[in-house]
Swiss-Prot record:
Residues bound to substrate: T361, T362
Coiled-coil regions, chain positions: none
Protein name per UniProt: Nacrein-like protein M
Occurrences of domain Alpha-carbonic anhydrase (ranges): 33-420
Miscellaneous section: Two hypotheses for calcium binding are proposed. Either the Gly-Xaa-Asn repeat domain bind calcium or sulfite and sialic acid provide the necessary negative charge in the N-glycan to promote calcium uptake.
GO molecular function: carbonate dehydratase activity; zinc ion binding
Residue ranges, annotated region (Disordered): 197-303
């Protein structure tokens, strides 16, 4: 999660750690000083705290994000509210630009208002600030958060900032009172997987123009219900993209990914076979985190949604020259995009989540964030990941695939709560 438009670190020169692996603390006092995701230099994530006095929390903070969430250690809170937005399913006019070596951000235009609703947890005055998606140095490990040590190729962040115009002080969450002060931000994190089937052909330039203006097919991803009979009118309908029974794993018996859904990326003999990371007994297999008896299986009512509209929006945006080509601060060209932020989320009935008090994941690493990390995953087209990794983040044309845009896991002892048993 980010908040500021930073200078590009290359404009300030590059420093390297000394023989003892130590970087000198600079006297810089800018909160928008340049930083990098290159882990070999002093501008990289392990040394962000040395770049500016404003960044000191990156090195000594007690509630730094992201973290590895251990599901069985998370504490169930019965009264945690459902995650909703006001207004519901609102289509916003946003602008996205090249964000240099950071994830491109979709920011609402003036007058576009969307608020997150987490009744009894925070007040109702957290206003949508941006949507961005993180990627990694490898295709498989791109999410900033992990659950039980497992990552996904991408992680979407919906950032909400307390609206100063309301004249209310940000309310502190009632989650044990471990930290003093207020939470200025609410950030919703969503694990994004990638797939090949069910997302249609690659859109051409003319189709992208229509898509970015908000023109989509008549059928709605959330149309006649999450299990509707008409496929695309329900995320995983009986005759739809995800097979007869959908619920038997990621995509059901006759779905896109083989006989038993989530037994590997593409069925029983997927990327890691029956007993691999995604196999029958692995993270996403029958008894794993996302399998029939696991965290995302029958017992807890979770299912991976194919976010088809979002996929085409992201793919078209990341491919557009205004976003893809490197731009210095002040020279950006904004691309207008009509976007419904809820497209990035699971359907309402599957918005089970983990929550904890953490920080921004980019400098200045401000420790005033309430994180709401979705348990259920969303799937986008593999072309989205390819397009994002091909966005230029550096003056020499180096793309985001080289260093990624994910901060390494932070070793904090923070209490994580969950809205589900």
């Amino acid at each position: 999660a980010s908040m500021f438009k930073h200078d590009h670190y290359m404009d300030n020169g590059v420093r390297y750690p000394n023989g003892d692996g130590i970087c000198e603390q600079l006297n810089e006092t800018k909160c928008d000083a340049g930083f990098s995701y290159d882990r070999s230099i002093c501008e990289g994530p392990h040394y962000w705290h040395t770049i500016s006095k404003w960044f000191i929390a990156c090195g000594i903070g007690q509630r730094q994000s992201p973290i590895n969430i251990v599901s069985y250690d998370a504490k169930f809170r019965q009264r945690l509210p459902k995650l909703k937005f006001k207004p519901h399913m609102e289509k916003l006019k946003t602008e996205v630009t090249n964000h240099q070596n950071r994830a491109p951000e979709f920011e609402p235009e003036d007058g576009e208002n969307l608020y997150v609703k987490l009744n009894n947890l925070v007040d109702g005055h957290y206003k949508f600030h941006n949507l961005h998606v993180h990627n990694g140095r490898t295709r498989r490990k791109g999410s900033e958060h992990s659950v039980n040590g497992r990552f996904t190729p991408m992680e979407a962040h919906l950032v909400f900032h307390h609206d100063d115009q309301t004249h209310f002080e940000p309310t502190r969450t009632k989650l044990g009172g471990a930290f003093p002060g207020h939470n200025d931000f609410v950030v919703v994190g969503v694990f994004h997987e990638v797939g090949d089937d069910g997302f249609g052909d690659e859109p051409d330039d003319e189709e992208c123009k229509r898509i970015l203006k908000g023109h989509h097919p008549d059928n709605n991803e959330n149309g006649n219900g999450d299990n509707g009979n008409n496929g695309y009118n329900g995320d995983n309908g009986n005759n739809g993209d995800n097979g007869n029974n959908g619920y038997n794993g990621d995509n059901g018996n006759n779905g896109d990914n083989g006989n038993n859904g989530y037994n590997g990326d593409n069925g029983n003999n997927g990327d890691n076979g029956n007993n691999g990371e995604n196999g029958n007994n692995g993270e996403n297999g029958n008894n794993g985190d996302n399998g029939n008896n696991g965290e995302n299986g029958h017992k807890h009512g979770c299912r991976v949604k194919k976010a088809k509209h979002l996929s085409r929006i992201l793919e078209c945006a990341y491919r557009n020259d205004k976003v893809r080509e490197f731009k210095k601060v002040g020279e950006e060209e904004g691309l207008d995009v009509h976007l419904t932020p809820e497209m990035a989320l699971p359907p309402l009935k599957y918005r089970h989540y983990y929550t904890y008090e953490g920080s921004l994941t980019t400098p200045p690493c401000t420790e005033s964030v309430l994180w709401v990390v979705q348990k259920c995953h969303v799937q986008v087209s593999r072309r989205v990941l390819h397009a994002l990794r091909n966005v230029e983040g550096y003056k020499d044309g180096t793309t985001l695939r080289k260093y990624g845009t994910r901060r390494p896991t932070q070793k904090n002892k923070v209490t994580v709560y969950k809205s589900f048993k």
